[in-house]
Structure formats: structure tokens, C-alpha cells
Amino acid sequence: PNNVASRLYIFGTKGSAVGSLIWIFLLVGVLAVGTVQLGNAILYAFGWNATWERWVLFVGISCVWIFMALFGTKVIARMNAAFVVALFCVMGYVVYLIAANGQMGDALTHGVMIPGVEVGQGFAYGVNYAIMTSGLLALFAGDFTRYARKESDLIPIAGVGSLFAVITYLFGALITYFGFSQAVEYFSAQGYDATGAAHAAITNPGISLVLAAGGVGLAIICLSQMKVETSNSIGGANAVTNLFDSLFGVKLSW
């Protein structure tokens, strides 16, 4: 996100500001979405509905991202593997519950779950999302292997990343199905109409993990999101640093 490659080899110092603006928009947006998803899971788990509780929670979560970006990167780097394994274990448990309840057939064959959305629209969204994640996977694979001894090391990393991306898509779809009805009821009680409640239910899978695993599921969501959003906070800060340096010659010292 600090645009080193584009700054040195493509766009130059001034031109790299465009890349910084794109990264800032992308990372801040992803950070906001992740914060809302985590916050909704916590609100659901504890039954908090008051406006002041929402304000305190979301401000508190944002402060945690800042604190972890400044002081917690080493801890997260050491615990990252455990977080990922724990998350996949919980997702696997949800899939087991679906199979045990005899719902696997319905979970794999149901139609579009949001009222008013046509099959073609859903397919277009799926293709668009796949394009976006493929680009991110390529970026991360290139970033993780930039110090590799040979170019062929990129192949297994990119392959494993793509495989687990597909597995995550499948698990995510099943998890969304598992808690869809309860999540729709929850968001309907918050004042959403049928379409809005269905959309919110699909985009907040953390509620399904809370339904399946209770406090354990919530804890794993928090830890997993902590790693992702800390990385996004650092990436956003790097992009802002490059933006100020490329446009104004100001070197931010954070």
C-alpha cells in the first residue's frame, strides 16, 4: 500500500499519489465494513440495542485497531496461525451442524435469498467479487514472495491461497444459510424492511458463528478480525504517508 513499486518504477513520486488515494479509499472502506460486521456480532451476542451502547462499542473497536496497529503487530504475527486454524474449526463445526440437521441439500441448492434480486444480478455480483479477490490474492502472493530465493516459490503460495479462498467461499455461503432466518428476524426488529434485513443478514456472518458456537465463536471472530483490521490500519497509514510525501514533501513520522 505504500506504493513503493509504482513510485520507483512506474508513476514516479507525484504520480504515486493516485495509487495512495485508491488504497486509502479501499482500505478505509474495508476497515469500516469489518468494524460494522464485528460490532453487529457483538451487539447480537450481548443483546445491546441502545444508541449509546452502539456508539461506545464502535468507537471502542476503532480505538482497538489503532492501538494494535501501533503496539500489537508482533503479538498478532505470532498468533496469526492459531487464529486462522481456530476460525476454520468453527466454520467446519457450523457445516457439521448443517449436515447433522439434514439441511445440507437445501443449503447447497437454495436460490437467491434477498427479495427482489434476480439470478443474473446475483451471478454478476459473484463474478465481480471473484475478480476483486483474485486481484488481492495476486497482490498478496507477490508481496509475500518478494524475498523468495526463486520465482517458482510463488506457485505453491498462490495455489494454496486460491484453494483456501474457494473453501472459504463455500464455508461462508453455508454459514450464511445456517443463521439466515435468525439474523433476518434480528435486523427486522431493528427497523429494516424485508430486503434490507435479508441483505444485512447475508453481510453479517458473525451472527451465524455466534448462534453456532456462542462465546467461543464470538471470541474467534474478534481475534480473526483483529489481525485483518490491524493490517488494514497499517496499510492505510502507509498510503496516507506516501500521499503527504508525494504531494507536499511532508514526511509523517508515525
What are these regions (language model features)?
Residues 5-9, 66-67, 126-158, 177-178, ...:
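Helix-loop junctions at the membrane interface of multi-pass solute transporters
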Residues 14-25, 58, 116-127, 206-224:
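Select transmembrane alpha-helical segments in multipass membrane proteins
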Residues 4-8, 36-54, 230-254:
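Helix-loop-helix connectors at the membrane interface of multi-pass transporters/channels
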